[in-house]
Amino acid sequence: IMLQTIAGKTVIVVDVLPGGQRPYFIKSLGLNGGVYIRVAGTTRPADRYMVRELLFEGSNRSFDQAICSELTVSEDDIDALCRAMQEEARRNARSDEQRAAIKNVGREQLLSWGILAEKDGVALATNAYAILTGNAAVPPAMIQCGVFKGKTRAVFVDRREYGGPIWEQIEQAYQFVLRNIHLGAEFDGLYRQDVYEIPPEAIRELIINAAVHRSYLDHGAIQVAIY
């Protein structure tokens, strides 16, 4: 609590720090109805997905690193995921130097990243493992893409829904956008260079950010719309 002068007036400023045992709720309303959050300057009730996320945060855990009890994982499964991750990294490398810098991925890396957990020497799949591999043990996380006629969502021109391993979803959504935006050309003397109306790097980054920063407790799909 402090005093601060603003526009010639002295006001009392109270700084309320976030608690470590979230979620906090109005006791008379209970946990399901009494949790409120601040969004863009407004106070609104938290939905059940947000409440679950706050419960994870309050216990110093995350949904991604929680054990996926419905899913078992073998050494062959682990090796297959490691190979797939390395192949994807090589495919996305833009130069020989980047390709040469790619390191082998193994069980220890998956453990340190929270993709696997371990108990009594036995590897356990986490929700992150299920999301990465597109396994049905967790609710499906999908990317829905659509092209619309005009500036509203009234009429579809084309639409696709992508599931499966998360990096495949990202690549498919990225290619969908490239297929459905304008492609022009720039000339430098005798040389022609194709130029998209939106930089491909920006498109890829937007889709990756949406996939990485979404809450996988929320079963809704990521939506990519082109007008």
Locations of regions flagged by a protein language model:
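Conserved N-terminal catalytic/coupling substructures associated with nucleotide/phosphate chemistry
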Residues: 1-227
